[in-house]
Amino acid sequence: SQYSSVDAIKRIIPADRKNTLIAVMINCGDYDAELLPQYDGTGPDCIRVCFHKAQALQAVELCRKIKEKGYKVYFQPMVALSYSDAEYLGLIGMANKFRPDGFYIVDSHGSMKQKDVARFFYLIENNLDKEIAVGFHSHNNLQLSYSNAQYLAALHTEHNLIIDSSIMGMGRGAGNLNTELFVEYLNETAGADYSTEPILCSIDNTI
């Protein structure tokens, strides 16, 4: 793990975080929720629980414990393509019961085509409680992160939509969706008003 404790994360969070929500990921089975301090607003705000298919029940219990400590929690079943429709609906049913703040479509191997994204989004849109946000976490092995994100952003949905990205697509393996590309797309097509200059400066200064 990059950070073994909340205290280690607190040391790198700016004193003035403004309106930024700080999120971290936990791999189910790698961290004991009993070690997690009560949320106090000085560390991470959101915890994303990543898990494999065989860990679903364990992940639900971990999410419950995290919620009880006051954090926002996101349910992140890895390798979405490994689930049948019935299995994925089962996950959605679990989420509706314990009510995470978000439920993620995860393209762990970067192998999802648009039809795959559409399939999982359809299952979520028609079955997940509308108060639960929908997230999309992609990897760019087939260079489809950008087009898949465009597809999702164009859909009409009652859910809040979260699309993960990173500067220059930094991420494991083939990387993720490029923030600098996607915010420009949103500015041009969705009426967004993101400033790209700070993003490009971050790339120049840190990469």
Where are these regions (language model features)?
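Catalytic cores and adjacent flexible loops of soluble metabolic enzymes
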Residues: S1-I207
